[in-house]
């Protein structure tokens, strides 16, 4: 399929980009799309809108204060944006609990003012940041603090670039989901920002199953597509974790609804991991080409292969990496529904939505624009059912 980026663009006026969250999490509009039909409700109505026989899957990653501002003796301001952990481990949980030192791959603002091999210090907490190479920074500090504690002291929440304002007090709470747990994301899984504990409780009370997995959202989620051929776009690599119970529940499911594009990408990656296992490959790394090249197996074969592998290796939780790229032509293996906000024109997330609902994505976005929906991370919501 020859896809052109121009086919996934739309006009997004600046004043439609939500710069702040609504007063209450659930005070959002909800567009319902079901097999071509569109209706408009309030997000509070999500409880009745979700089919009872569904499994609702959330991404429980927690946004870390990934922006660190330091100054040289000359006064030059250097901003360090944490991307991925490097040492002592590439596993977020282990690095966040490390004491004394760690290394991260970073984006560095005003990098020309900070020479490789030199260090910056923050005396108030005895922090030293050493630029090891172009984009690797080593942090050293007193080992009575974990790196997580350190970030709480000095880091700032990394709001998306299109919000285009300084972090405010409300963002500490509102740019996290109420169920966030596993520290490691540098962007929020924003479809979940609308949910409250009360709404999740009501969903469970009506008999709908709820489950969690983890994808640590990377800064690559904001990377614009520049490649002439869409499939040539270099997809970002993200760390994912799934519990045995979640896989077992997927086997029992009637319908699976992903809360957000990150949950959807994790679920679909899980299927392809099972397909790899059936084919004799146990490396949990899903490349962007895998879904378009691997031999197909049934969903049951895939999930059972994963459970069997977990039995053999004595694991109740599996982790891997995914750079899955979902665009029109992709055949969904696990997801029957998607709860999601409204995304940037020409982004990989628009392509994912277009893959899920087809050409109707344009109708959905036109409806949202003409009904004064708020767009992007702090914007309104939609429930899309196939």
Please name every model-derived segment:
Residues 1-386:
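Surface-exposed, charge/polar-rich loops and edge strands
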């Amino acid at each position: 399929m020859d896809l052109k980026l121009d086919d996934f663009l739309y006009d997004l006026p600046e004043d439609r980009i939500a710069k702040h969250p609504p007063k209450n999490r659930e005070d959002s509009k909800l567009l319902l799309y079901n097999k071509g039909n569109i209706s408009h409700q309030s997000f509070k109505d999500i409880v009745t809108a979700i089919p009872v026989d569904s499994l609702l899957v959330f991404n429980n990653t927690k946004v870390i204060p990934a922006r660190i501002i330091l100054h040289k003796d000359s006064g030059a301001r250097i901003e360090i944006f944490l991307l991925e952990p490097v040492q002592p481990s590439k596993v977020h949980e282990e690095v966040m609990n490390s004491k004394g030192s760690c290394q991260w791959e970073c984006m560095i603002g005003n990098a020309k003012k900070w020479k490789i091999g030199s260090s910056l210090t923050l005396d108030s907490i005895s922090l030293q940041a050493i630029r090891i190479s172009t984009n690797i920074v080593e942090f050293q500090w007193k080992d009575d603090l974990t790196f997580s504690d350190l970030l709480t002291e000095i880091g700032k929440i990394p709001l998306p670039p299109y919000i285009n304002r300084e972090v405010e007090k409300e963002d500490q709470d509102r740019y996290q989901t109420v169920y966030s747990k596993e520290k490691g994301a540098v962007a929020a899984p924003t479809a979940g920002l609308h949910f409250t504990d009360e709404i999740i409780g009501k969903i469970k009370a009506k008999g709908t199953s709820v489950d969690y997995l983890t994808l640590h959202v990377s800064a690559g989620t904001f990377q614009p597509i520049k490649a002439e051929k869409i499939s040539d776009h270099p997809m970002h690599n993200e760390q994912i974790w799934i519990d045995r119970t979640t896989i077992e529940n997927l086997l029992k499911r009637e319908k699976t609804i992903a809360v957000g594009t990150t949950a959807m990408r994790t679920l679909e990656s899980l299927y392809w991991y099972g397909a790899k296992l059936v084919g004799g490959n146990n490396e949990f790394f899903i490349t962007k080409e895998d879904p378009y090249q691997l031999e197909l197996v049934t969903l049951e074969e895939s999930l059972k292969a994963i459970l069997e592998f977990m039995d053999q290796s004595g694991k109740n939780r599996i982790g891997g990496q995914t750079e899955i790229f979902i665009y029109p032509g992709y055949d969904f293996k696990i997801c029957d529904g998607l709860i999601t906000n409204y995304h940037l024109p020409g982004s990989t997330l628009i392509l994912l939505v277009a893959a899920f609902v087809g050409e109707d994505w344009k109708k959905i976005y036109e409806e949202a624009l003409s009904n004064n929906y708020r767009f992007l991370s702090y914007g309104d919501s939609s429930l899309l059912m196939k």
